[in-house]
Amino acid sequence: MKKRLLSVALCGLFLADALAVEIRVAPGQPLDAAFREAREMRRLGSIGHNDTLFITLADGVHRIVEALMLRPEDSGTPQSPTVVRAEHAGCATIDGGVALTGWRRATREELRGVPSATQPNLWVCDAPRVNGRIVETRQLWQDGRRLPQASLVPQDSLLPMLAFDKEHREIHIPARYATFLSRNPHFQPWMLVHQRWAIALLRIKEVVMADTLAKITFLEPESRREFEHPWPQPVIGDTLDDGRIVSSSFNLLGDVSLLDRPGEWVQSYPNGLIYYVSGDKGGARPSAEITIPVAEQLVRVEGSLERPVHDILFDGIRFAHTVWTTPNREGWVTLQAGFPIVDAYKLAEPGLPHKASLENQAWIGRPQSAVTLFGARYVNFSHCQFVNLGACGVDFVESSSRCDVADCHFEDVGATAVLIGHFATGGHETHAPFLPFSADALCREMRVVRCRVKDVGMEDWGASAINAGYVSSTTIAQNEVSGCKWSGICLGWGWLPAPKEKASLRRWPMRDNHLTGNHVFDFGLQLHDCGALYTLSYQPGSSIEGNRLERMGRAPFATNQRVFYIYLDEATDGFTIRDNVMPEWRIGQNQTGPKMKIEE
């Protein structure tokens, strides 16, 4: 007997004789089948001109292992939108994780390198296989709490490095710290490096002891990226304004020998075995479910400039559990704001056509996101939740317009919660102006409003809560932002002053953007050279008004004291700034332009 997986119903709405067509999906039923059915109904004309098409997710967990794809054929219309909704707001989850099961005690061989004091509390289990491959991860969650990987010191603590040797591509640390590493070939230890306004995650290649020093080298390509790129690099022995002498800091992670605190874990390779130090009484088997993420993305909207995806609303959906493993393959060295360096180096002779004083070049990539959108128009998110994510939350990459993220909640996000717009990635040198021939290539008329963003940059400290790059007519308003390791809300990219050529000015991509009525607090918790609100480049007609900014972080391992409530970084110009509330007048300016209007 065949059973229908998806139920389709016609139900009356109190909307001027309009009908709603509803496709209901229960947990365990395939989400992609629901969207295919909706696509076919539109193709065959089964939906009236004024009918709303609802795809309703029943309460519970809807697990996926590959991203749900939406294409132009999935589009609605202004009169007949497609609404993807939870049966009850926040109670239906699109989830990229699965529960770890089969916990057992480790064998003698598996205990190799584990500290003896940890062994009575240690449990192991096999990572699941998905599509024929063992799941590799850098994230685990227990009852919604991100579990820390095994580390030399707690992950909110760091230790000062002794030297940063660019010639030999080495970082020097006290030898006593490196003796902890087990040299077990089934584990890949790595180093977290704190460097000015960013971090680097570097896989360790070799440790050479030299008296009281440990000289550490790293795998490629991150070794080349870390030691060749000039900004930002670690500092050694800098003197602060208050007379303190500081050096950049580090931590060691990912080795079985570092398992010494309850809740810590590590994964071996290539068998994927998960090692976990029980926090339960008496070191008992973990009683609360531990989730391993298996999906890198949950939703991918694939439109284009010529054929956008449009008129779709996600309403009340909870998005949870994505995996981020890029550093396991190539390390992670960022330029700024969580954008990874692909190649960067100092110029022997400074100068590029658009800036004679520029002394470096850099090409960057883009971090992954749980929900990624290309060519979207009127694709909106309302009352959604984005939690327990390996990297970013929502990313409007390019060619998107009139999209809203409204009344949403973001918490425990590995990198940036909301990304919008072009950031000069790929083959576009990141300092070179982005001047698209068509304004439609930009993200414009975008809104992020009334959202609550808490605890971002959990994996990459250099990320911000909300970041809009080359955008126009974009509003970020009435959001509550807290728990940022670096800056809170960022607007602009490129380090670009107003162009002198009229043709370039007509095509200028950043203008008429507004940061209004946001409440940002508890920012700069780990990295400085930051602001609660942070801007770059010339943006005529833009404003920063009516924001409440407070509680800047101390960043105990920062090597500079550049932390501001509003940071107008290089070439910021064209803004009106007024009526912002902050404990003290602390606005940083770095080579700002002549067209600023700042009122106390």
Language-model segments: residues:
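Sec-dependent N-terminal signal peptides
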Residues: 4-14
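Boundary at the C-terminal end of the N-terminal hydrophobic targeting segment
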Residues: 18-20
